[in-house]
Amino acid sequence: MASDAFMQTACPADAAEQLEAEHAEWAQLGCGAVPPPPAAASRPSRAAVAAYVGEVVDRMRAQSRADERVYVKCGQLVHLRVRARSVPLDDWLTSAELALVSEVAEPVRANRAFVEVSLRYFELTEYATLRALGLQSALKYEEMYLAKLEGGAIESMGQFFVRIAATAATWTMREPAFGRALVGEGATWCAVFNAYLTALYRQLVVPATPIMLFAGRARGSLASCYLLNPQVSSSTEAVEAITTEVARILLNRGGIGISFQSFDRAVSRDCKRGIMGALKLLDSMAMAINSDSERPTGICVYLEPWHCDVRAVLNMRGLLARDESTRCDNLFSCLWVPDLLFDRYLAHLEGREGVVWTLFDDRASHLSRLHGPAFTAEYERLEREGLGVETVPVQDLAFLIVRSIVMTGSPFVMFKDACNRHYHMDTAGDALTGSNLCTEIVQRASPDAHGVCNLASVNLPRCVREGEGGALAFDFAALSTAAATAAIFVNAMMLGGQYPTEKAARGVARHRSLGIGFQGLHTLLLELGMDMLSPAARRLNVEIAERLLLAVMATSATLCEYGCAPFEDFARSKFARGLMPFDGYEGVVLSLPRAWARLREKVARHGLYNAQFVALMPTVSSSQVTEGSEGFSPVFTNMFSKVTMSGELLRPNLPLMRALRKHFTREASRLGAVRALDREQWSVAAALGDLAPGHPLAKFKTAFEYDQERLIDLCADRAPFVDQSQSMSLFVTEPMDGKVPASQIMNLLVYAYKKGLKTGLYYCKIRKATNNGVFTGGDLVCSGCHL
């Protein structure tokens, strides 16, 4: 059907009627400027309704700055536009553009009556909550996640959830233990489908972006993160790895972390450009593949800081690039830092003179396989024997690292020894070599098998219930149920997923690594009336992480109890010796010691189906559909503003806006507070003055207003219960002179190192002193682990 023909057909009657009802509600908000919609009695066309919604949203969304109700109403209108463009279930099932695979379409047809009842229930009940989330949520669904069909049609919200739930249910039924663990004995497709559907449309479980885009469809990979360690040592080997493995993963929209540490030949007659020639090819490939994609992905190159080309990599982006032949603006880098570098930097800070750092070439390649005391001993032996290619004062290298971070947004920083120390396998003599694009996945990658992680997150603000006296309280039972559901859901997606390369499929089969995280921590705390750094918030932060790990690990053990084989290396893992992830940390106090004791016994008897469990990823995209804060980070502004081709897009911090309305009972006072906030870049403290700690508005701080060391403390507090890692970003405000002191960033990295974290820095977000702009040295947009 031609696009014009479909859009000129009559809009569904219920959408046109709802549009008239919405117009009456606009009037109640005092928005007399909203034009009347096409009359429902005239059966307006889909195109007319879509055009009307676009006109009203464009006209009214600027008022979201002062009235959160307008923001919500604009979102509800966008959902009506989605309804106007939707098609019946039969057309959806047979859409060539959607391309549902038969394994998913056939169970939906076979259980059509149940599916239709489920859809109807969603539309009559839960959809109202989802429609009321806000404009950003509605636009993100419409523009990115809802599949585009023929003739300008789009899948409905209900069909979107059905597609994902049906895919998960179909593959769950292929493994009896999955269904039994999810819904009990005698699991049926309908029961499993309903469990997933409910968790999805209530936004308790939020899948990763690849799953939302490609679940049930004949294209795309469902995995989020790929870790590669091709162990290349020449340009020829690098080109082969890039054009085979890397290209195929990028074409499937996977985010990549790739270790090039083994390519450590110094510039010579035989190797004229060192590693940079290979990185330039990688950069060009990333640009070419992303250039025609609405959903770009990315690549992060991992190196250890003793690599002979580390200076070149630190200078490959932005203003630091010497010329176009070395510019790699489409790549990110991450330093895989051994403890020795920070120990030497600390010695320099303590006054020791002449502390140096030595760079090595391929004569020291074996250092990448060592960590801890073994690395230190061998590194210092190589120094004594004079095998280094360059020696630099350690403070000079630290300055180069921080300068690159501030000016280009890269490198990220991860701590090699912490990652190896807390890994579930013994890595002595065979150390881990890198992480993924977003620094939260810690897995082994080898020349014959990639590390692969499949992700989902639990939406913490949905785990809230009314307690005694109507006060809100966190529902730990809801968290545990959501985490267990997410674990089985991701396992099902792994079972049914298609992988871009054989090495990726081999890595999945070998490790079955889960990456279950959470999002909306800051939003949750605000709803519960807590400042993010209050003692109560710190306790809740740890208990959430503990319950999440417990639920996911217990589910994995249950799968083995019900007949699944443990992951391939279980017998050689620390788990087989009775150890848990938190046992590698000192001073851990468990809130549920008996539950953990029972789990230890269960693991000893049955094993674990998965090798890894929890990873706290950035949730940039999915936090937009839930209208919550990203991952575990505080909001970085109380009024997000982005200028696009279609105008300014605003996203207010809804808990703050509602608190303002509740606190300022007179409309004039509320609007005065809003104007003051607008003048002060939406800083509550700057606009309203110093508020008492118990004041209902005092807790609405942004990430830039928090002490960054205290935010690092929150990460360290929950680290024992995060067996992979956390994408920890830092938020720094530029001084009035426009110069961020290098020592400020380096001191935060040292603090993270001393706290024993695995990820020392993902992004360093810098707020300009003169305006509310945020500079990150380059915007990474990833459809993989960014969720």
UniProtKB/Swiss-Prot annotation:
SUPFAM superfamilies xrefs: PFL-like glycyl radical enzymes
Residues at the site labelled Interacts with thioredoxin/glutaredoxin: C782, C785
Highest taxon above the source species: Viruses
Catalyzed reactions: a 2'-deoxyribonucleoside 5'-diphosphate + [thioredoxin]-disulfide + H2O = a ribonucleoside 5'-diphosphate + [thioredoxin]-dithiol
Site (Important for electron transfer) location in chain: Y762, Y763
Gene Ontology biological-process entries: deoxyribonucleotide biosynthetic process; DNA replication; release from viral latency
Ligand binding (substrate): T209, S224, C225, G255, N436, L437, C438, T439, E440, P618, T619, V620, S621, S622
Keyword check for DNA damage: no
UniProt keyword annotation of Oxidoreductase present: yes
Residues of the site described as Important for hydrogen atom transfer: C225, C453
Main EC class the enzyme belongs to: oxidoreductase
EC nos: 1.17.4.1
Intrachain disulfide bonds: C225-C453
UniProt keyword annotations, A-Z: ATP-binding, Disulfide bond, DNA replication, Early protein, Nucleotide-binding, Oxidoreductase, Viral latency, Viral reactivation from latency
Pfam families linked to this entry: Ribonuc_red_lgC, Ribonuc_red_lgN
Entry function: Ribonucleoside-diphosphate reductase holoenzyme provides the precursors necessary for viral DNA synthesis. Allows virus growth in non-dividing cells, as well as reactivation from latency in infected hosts. Catalyzes the biosynthesis of deoxyribonucleotides from the corresponding ribonucleotides.
Family per similarity comment: Belongs to the ribonucleoside diphosphate reductase large chain family.
Name of the protein in its database record: Ribonucleoside-diphosphate reductase large subunit
Organism: Bovine herpesvirus 1.1 (strain Cooper) (BoHV-1)
Lineage, highest ranks first: Viruses, Duplodnaviria, Heunggongvirae, Peploviricota, Herviviricetes
